[in-house]
Swiss-Prot record:
InterPro entries: Ribosomal_Su5_D2-typ_SF (IPR020568), Ribosomal_uS5 (IPR000851), Ribosomal_uS5_C (IPR005324), Ribosomal_uS5_euk/arc (IPR005711), Ribosomal_uS5_N (IPR013810), Ribosomal_uS5_N_CS (IPR018192), Ribsml_uS5_D2-typ_fold_subgr (IPR014721)
List of residues that carry Phosphoserine: 264, 281
Glycyl lysine isopeptide (Lys-Gly) (interchain with G-Cter in ubiquitin) crosslink location in chain: 54, 58, 275
Cross-link Glycyl lysine isopeptide (Lys-Gly) (interchain with G-Cter in SUMO2) residue location(s): 275
Domain spans labelled S5 DRBM: 102-165
Name of protein: Small ribosomal subunit protein uS5
Region called Disordered, residue ranges: 1-56
Residue(s) carrying N-acetylalanine: 2
First-listed, main subcellular location of the protein, grouped into a coarse class: cytoplasm
Subcellular locations according to the entry: Cytoplasm; Nucleus, Nucleolus
Amino acid sequence: MADDAGAAGGPGGPGGPGMGGRGGFRGGFGSGVRGRGRGRGRGRGRGRGARGGKAEDKEWLPVTKLGRLVKDMKIKSLEEIYLFSLPIKESEIIDFFLGASLKDEVLKIMPVQKQTRAGQRTRFKAFVAIGDYNGHVGLGVKCSKEVATAIRGAIILAKLSIVPVRRGYWGNKIGKPHTVPCKVTGRCGSVLVRLIPAPRGTGIVSAPVPKKLLMMAGIDDCYTSARGCTATLGNFAKATFDAISKTYSYLTPDLWKETVFTKSPYQEFTDHLVKTHTRVSVQRTQAPAVATT
């Protein structure tokens, strides 16, 4: 209500007692048009959102080579992209393969401030986790002047950062994979998160933030260990995501490439060498004997 009054030129408007507070909140430039500028910016934001909604209904026109290959059905699955470590620059590629099964959840929205000459400029930072609960998970972080814009940007970045999750067994290989294949560790800042395999039926033993990411990754049972300043939710989530993404960064013996011993050319073409061999006679000349006394 105070902001609306300020925009209308009330007590909290430009030149009024609330000018510094509102200027600190939005960080406008100039003293006379701060309230009106904010109002116009907010209106334009709504217009962009409406036009963006209509644009989403339009047909996807890829702008990258990978996008063209995906749309033309030359690439059949995300795993083909991950196999060759191709960078994904368009979020529509993820929607093309996983659109129906993807679920997103906002982990946190926190205000961040920057000190300027006009006061404090406040923006909103959104942390969004996205996954299909079946081996794919992503984490996006976006900062914007408006909450809705930050969430939309974080969802797009989360789609672009989706990684495959490797799952395994705690003991015997019975049924479907249900836990992490072995102990993995992720780190961000001072936060260190360790994921430990757990027996079937244990569930996810962890704090709420890693639990959401592990559930979205499709991991049913897991022990976790965390140290550092885990109250910093951003670093906590990033460390967990780093640990999950490391499940495919190592090779276990069952993934070792089978060694095939091939014969050397001398062994392979022995018969040919025998047939084409010609005996060369070498005449040895004997040096004359030297008489010794």
